[in-house]
């Protein structure tokens, strides 16, 4: 086999640049040539991708039913058949679908195929249509998977019943804890946002989408006098969220900050992390908040509840339990000692999810596949 590896994912900015650079760098350090296939979701028509020797831009669609994906599959298979990769690591549902189908012939020639499930679309409480569509597909695709990586307990238990060569549970994608250790001038960060040093500040990070359920954050904060809410992210539901804030007379307390590169500073300037999402895999946003020492009030869904338990690091509520979220947020805001105690617990917990810890897990798995042995 050649000393080449291929990473496959749907998009560059929102996936590859966030999750995969440390692993691409590791392969380069081991002497491998690193190739990448994904769509360009950046504003730059010719972005520079670190630790990448060859980037093949393919217009992946997130919808598995999109006609555009037929051409993506053709070009992806053509590339895989031509390059003789030692290992192909597929990510995202569509990347995992097309990548594994395109690599079937390559597997017969010795290429190892890895798929990371960043959160199956079928899960406890998922709509029936998700189970009817995604469960059979993932079960079938596991036949052409040498290593299926899961990142939460529920997915791991389910995937062990599939036909993949091996199923592993790793601690997410890794959090760079060093980013959350530096000193931050809380007052200065707050002043830049028009928020006073003694005001209560709630923060959430993520795309403005139906899945993130940001409406619950605004509704839960509304009864808490003087509480500010920071939204870090972009998305097509922002206009609806702005309308909700106006209707609740909260437009001066809800701050839409857009896509931010200073998340560690914003977390350090906040008091409570609030995250009522409907579906997660193992949320980086929550892990980063925990690394920053924040207590968390989050929805009791897969992934979120892998990271905290009730009263341990925060509180869990049903995703749309607005009054429950309000109650838990108010309790934390009224008790600085409780916030500090839970925040310190979360800092300690994140050592298991550090970039160093996960990189060690992943490289052991990679080595095991490439050396032809069980890691």
Where are these regions (language model features)?
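A short, well-ordered alpha-helix in the C-terminal region of glycosyltransferases
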Residues: 324, 331, 338-352, 361-364, ...
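A conserved mid-protein helix/loop that constitutes part of the nucleotide-sugar donor-binding site
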Residues: 17-22, 200-223, 236-242, 323
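Conserved acidic donor-binding segment of nucleotide-sugar-dependent glycosyltransferases
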Residues: 309-311, 315-322, 331-336
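Short hydrophobic beta-strand element within catalytic cores of glycosyltransferases
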Residues: 295-298, 308
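Donor nucleotide-sugar binding/catalytic pocket of nucleotide-sugar-dependent glycosyltransferases
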Residues: 56-57, 139-186
């Amino acid at each position: 086999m050649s000393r080449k590896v291929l990473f496959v994912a749907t998009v560059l900015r929102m996936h590859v640049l966030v999750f995969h650079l440390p692993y691409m760098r590791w392969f380069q350090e081991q002497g491998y040539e690193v190739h990448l296939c994904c769509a360009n979701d950046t504003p730059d028509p010719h972005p520079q991708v670190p630790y990448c020797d060859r980037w093949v831009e393919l217009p992946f669609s997130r919808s598995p039913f999109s006609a555009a994906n037929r051409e993506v599959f053709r070009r992806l298979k053509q590339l895989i058949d031509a390059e003789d990769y030692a290992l192909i690591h597929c990510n995202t549902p569509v990347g995992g679908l097309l990548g594994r189908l395109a690599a079937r012939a390559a597997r017969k020639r010795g290429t190892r195929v890895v798929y990371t499930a960043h959160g199956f679309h079928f899960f406890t409480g998922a709509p029936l249509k998700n189970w009817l569509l995604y469960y059979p597909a993932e079960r079938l695709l596991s036949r052409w998977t040498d290593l299926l990586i899961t990142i939460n307990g529920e997915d791991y238990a389910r995937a062990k019943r599939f036909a993949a060569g091996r199923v592993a549970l790793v601690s997410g994608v890794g959090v760079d804890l060093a980013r959350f250790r530096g000193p931050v001038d809380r007052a200065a960060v707050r002043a830049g946002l028009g928020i006073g040093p003694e005001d209560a500040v709630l923060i959430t990070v993520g795309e403005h989408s139906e899945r993130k359920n940001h409406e619950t954050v605004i509704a839960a904060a509304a009864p808490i006098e003087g509480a500010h809410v920071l939204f870090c992210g972009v998305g097509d539901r922002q206009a609806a969220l702005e309308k909700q804030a106006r209707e609740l007379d909260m437009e001066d307390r809800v701050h839409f900050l857009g896509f931010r590169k200073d998340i560690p500073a914003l977390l350090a300037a906040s008091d409570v992390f609030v995250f009522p999402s409907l579906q997660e895999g193992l949320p980086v946003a929550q892990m980063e908040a925990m690394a920053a020492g924040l207590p968390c009030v989050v929805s009791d869904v897969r992934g979120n509840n892998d990271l905290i338990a009730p009263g341990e690091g925060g509180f869990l509520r049903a995703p749309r339990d607005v009054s429950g979220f309000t109650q838990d947020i108010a309790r934390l805001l009224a008790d600085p000692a409780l916030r500090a105690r839970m925040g310190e617990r979360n800092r300690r917990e994140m050592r298991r999810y550090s970039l160093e810890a996960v990189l060690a897990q992943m490289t052991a798995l990679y080595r095991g596949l490439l050396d032809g042995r069980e890691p």
